Design a protein with these regions (language model features):
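Cytosol-facing boundaries of transmembrane alpha helices in integral membrane proteins
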Residues: 3, 17, 29-30, 47
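Amphipathic, non-membrane alpha-helical rod segments
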Residues: 64-108, 157-218
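C-terminal region of N-terminal signal peptides and the immediate post-cleavage residues
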Residues: 20-43
């Protein structure tokens, strides 16, 4: 195994682990998607509701592509997320058809609220998708580090550098191992804690999203440090 290339590859992965989280931004308020009060006309209300549905379908389409193309996701998590996205892609157009068939402003308004309350695309579904991808990405990097650590130890043991340099490299490896262990602790259970959150649990389940985001951030920080340690070991040993 080319330890130098592996170490540098892992260092790069460590910096990008959880990149999916960058897309996790709530871009829509947790309110009705209509632009005005219940006093607007029925036709205008239906049009506004349709726009709200189409916007969410656009977001879900992007999420579906992200999930399909992600190299970080586990097979089981990918399957679960694809099923959830597909259900929303079926449910939202069906809801829109109901709204377009409503004959009173009151009924259309009531049904329109379901675009938000029944799906929570922007405050729950989209963020949790990105968090699951990010968490799985961190886990994958942790696993790669587990392969790298004994390789680096062997490299240190067999190196012809001075005892002082070898001791410095060993200290880096101890720090690297500690950071990877911390990352594993932070990320443990994160994906499973959010993947099955539902709109019905909002806003109570917002705390899980917040906690997951913080754990991912902490784990990514540890991995970035571990990646720096790996690169420094390689530099010290001239490998």
């Amino acid at each position: 195994m080319n330890t130098r290339l592996l170490a540098r590859g892992v260092a790069t992965l460590a910096l990008t682990a959880g990149l999916g989280l960058a897309g996790s931004v709530a871009v829509d308020a947790d309110t009705t998607p209509t632009p005005a009060s219940q006093t607007i006309g029925l036709t205008a209300l239906k049009a506004a509701c349709n726009v709200a549905v189409q916007r969410r379908l656009g977001t879900l389409a992007a999420d579906a592509t992200f999930v399909k193309d992600s190299a970080a996701l586990t097979g089981s998590d990918r399957t679960i997320l694809e099923g959830q996205i597909s259900a929303d892609q079926v449910g939202l157009p069906a809801l829109d058809r109901t709204i377009q068939g409503d004959t009173t402003g009151k009924q259309a308004w009531t049904d329109c609220q379901m675009i938000v309350t029944g799906y929570r695309v922007y405050v729950l579904e989209d963020p949790k998708i990105h968090e699951v991808i990010a968490a799985d990405g961190v886990t994958k990097v942790d696993e790669t580090f587990a392969t790298l650590i004994p390789e680096l130890q062997s490299l240190i043991n067999n190196s012809s550098v001075s005892a002082t340099v070898k001791a410095e490299a060993q200290a880096d490896l101890v720090d690297l191992t500690s950071k990877v262990d911390a990352s594993q602790t932070s990320i443990s259970g994160v994906a499973s804690s959010v993947i099955n959150l539902t709109p019905a649990g909002w806003p109570g389940n917002a705390v899980q999203l917040t906690s997951a985001a913080q754990n991912i951030k902490t784990a990514r920080t540890d991995l970035a440090g571990a990646g720096a340690d790996a690169n420094h070991i390689i530099q010290l040993l001239g490998a």
